[in-house]
Amino acid sequence: MHAYDAAPGDDGLPAVLWHHGTPNVGAPPEPLADMAVQLGLRWVSYDRPGYGGSTRWPGRRAGSAAVLGERVADALGIGRFAVMGHSGGGAHALACAALLRERVTAAVSVSAPAPYAAEGLDWFTGMYASGAAGFRAALRGRAELERHQAAAAYDPEMFTPEDHAALEGDWSWFGEVVAAAQAGGPGGQIDDDLAYVAPWGGDPAEVTAPVLIMHGDQDRVVPSAHGGWLAGRCPSAELRLLPGDGHISAMRAAPAALEWLAGISRRTAGAEPG
């Protein structure tokens, strides 16, 4: 497994374990790097199995992030840490927080999907057509999803005008991590998509740390109803709906999330788990 550490050996800094989206690699978000330094945060992350330098793990679930995250933290000598993720990474971050309650101090989820079996949520309503088709293929199994992905093409309609502006401007970094992820073939994305329609293996209702859910109200990739459901499921969640934002442009609010997370991380640094 390939891991990242923005401040190797600096055990005095509160750590944030970043969970990347689909298809991405785990490089911590470049647009937030300077702010993380200013806030005194230590970014750590890893490539999920099948991406970048990490070998595949067929059958992994969102909850597998707890196993992987714990390995990274242990290897780096990190005891407690916050988690943060965007898109599918938000689902992995919340599942990690649910399963590692003794270690996770806070969680931030931006534009994340809810579990497929989320009670009372119509999972596909508001989702762009080709994205919904891909997840329906995943529900029919790995072979069907592989056939679908082999024939699929990029659909610019998945993103709003605000998303496209972000991708061409302050969040052009996404192009780099997507290219790095796709260079290794489709395996990581296929395993991710199968995980999103399978049980997470960790219930958001079991998260005990403070949670911040952020979601653009114009999101076509993961409709904002998913964020609302997650906020209602996590016992201590705060929901911030972002007017006019889509799936990518929602990350323009990430600096505020980082400040929120840094404040909690400082208060809990060195505290005994419990």
Predicted regions and their residues:
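Short beta-strand/loop motif that positions the catalytic acidic residue
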Residues: 207, 213-215, 219
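Conserved acidic catalytic loop of the alpha/beta-hydrolase fold
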Residues: 64-81
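Catalytic active-site module of serine/aspartate enzymes centered on a nucleophile-bearing elbow/loop
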Residues: 237-274
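Conserved alpha/beta-hydrolase "acid-adjacent" motif
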Residues: 220-226
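Gly/Ala-rich beta-loop-alpha elbow adjacent to hydrolase catalytic centers
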Residues: 85-89, 93
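Alpha/beta-hydrolase
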Residues: 127-202
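Conserved HGGG/HGGXW glycine-rich cap/lid loop of the alpha/beta-hydrolase fold
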Residues: 2-53
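Flexible "cap/lid" loop of the alpha/beta hydrolase fold
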Residues: 106-140
